[in-house]
């Protein structure tokens, strides 16, 4: 017969593990979807548009005795603007700071373009690396095996996983491996914490996601959302004021929409999701302002968690 004290002693004897796992890949490979799947909650915005993740977002998951801190880095691509350069630099910096690197490849696209460039760049990164092939349910197994072999010829990956971030297939195997692979040590964060992103910033990211989803190709990436006011009210609700910054008057008209239709839809969708996360009523007020060349303002980069490139 085992007593409660004996069970507690046995549990205490199992060493805890913790570490940082950088998830890198080309834009739209499914990194944010996978992070949200592995963490079990929304910590990173998802849209069909590329380059939606701008800074490193940490999602925190507990699996067995391990605390796994995922770093959802911006997609790596050929930079053209100052903001692009900052995002790519941040992604590679996150990879080099991690205990382990997970390269996510879209199996449908294979190794070409940005994915090939990333593989070459990983040759100079000395952290342990694993390969994760995403969207495997859309590709023949024979082609998946060829893709895995080709990637492993370029970089010596410790393991190769085949998953679907959308359905969760194969994700449990990834978590089992990471929980055993990370170094022994105390947990970095409280057990109930799922992200180190401040709520004000997460709320702004949610609004930015709804902006992308609503406007599709109409609004360029020259937009930025800031939470300017956060008021906890006596009735238990929260009043949030956010500003959507764009670079030109023509972009402001697109964000507002005819008769304010677009901004109302964006506000409704964002308010609903923020309220669900906070588990309290939310009053969200959105304003659209023109700030010319905000993409060249060092202060805006700091607010996004990015270093300002020279």
Swiss-Prot record:
Residues that bind GTP: 25-32, 72-76, 134-137
MF annotations from Gene Ontology: GTP binding; GTPase activity; ribosomal small subunit binding; small ribosomal subunit rRNA binding
Domain KH type-2 residue range list: 215-292
Signal sequence segment: none
Localization of this protein: Cytoplasm; Cell inner membrane
Function as written in the Swiss-Prot or TrEMBL entry: An essential GTPase that binds both GDP and GTP, with rapid nucleotide exchange. Plays a role in 16S rRNA processing and 30S ribosomal subunit biogenesis and possibly also in cell cycle regulation and energy metabolism.
HAMAP family xref list: GTPase_Era
Name of the protein described by the UniProt record: GTPase Era
Native source organism of the sequence: Sinorhizobium medicae (strain WSM419) (Ensifer medicae)
Gene: era
């Amino acid at each position: 017969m085992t007593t409660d004290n004996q069970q507690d002693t046995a549990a205490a004897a199992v060493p805890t593990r913790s570490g940082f796992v950088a998830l890198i890949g080309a834009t739209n490979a499914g990194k944010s979807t996978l992070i949200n799947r592995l963490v079990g909650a929304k910590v990173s915005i998802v849209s069909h548009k590329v380059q939606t993740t701008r800074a490193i977002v940490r999602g925190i998951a507990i699996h067995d005795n391990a605390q796994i801190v995922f770093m959802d880095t911006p997609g790596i691509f050929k930079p053209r603007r100052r903001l692009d350069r900052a995002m790519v630099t941040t992604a590679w910096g996150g990879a080099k700071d991690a205990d382990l690197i997970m390269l996510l490849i879209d199996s449908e696209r294979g190794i070409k373009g940005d994915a090939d460039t990333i593989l070459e760049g990983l040759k100079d990164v000395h952290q342990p690396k694993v390969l994760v092939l995403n969207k495997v349910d859309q590709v023949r197994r024979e082609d998946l095996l060829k893709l895995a072999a080709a990637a492993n010829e370029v970089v010596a990956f410790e393991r190769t996983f085949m998953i679907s971030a959308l359905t969760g297939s194969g994700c449990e195997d990834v978590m089992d491996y990471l929980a055993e692979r990370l170094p022994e040590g105390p947990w970095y964060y409280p057990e109930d914490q799922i992200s180190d992103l401040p709520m004000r910033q997460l709320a702004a990211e949610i609004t930015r996601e709804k902006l992308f989803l609503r406007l599709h190709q109409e609004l360029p990436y020259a937009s930025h959302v800031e939470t300017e006011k956060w008021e906890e009210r006596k009735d238990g609700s929260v009043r949030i004021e956010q500003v959507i910054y764009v670079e030109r008057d023509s972009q402001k008209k697109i964000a507002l929409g005819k008769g304010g239709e677009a901004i109302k839809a964006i506000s409704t969708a964002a308010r609903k999701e923020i309220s669900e996360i906070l588990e309290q009523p939310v009053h969200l007020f959105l304003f659209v302002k023109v700030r010319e060349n905000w993409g060249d303002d060092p202060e805006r980069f700091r607010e996004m968690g990015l270093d300002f490139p020279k």
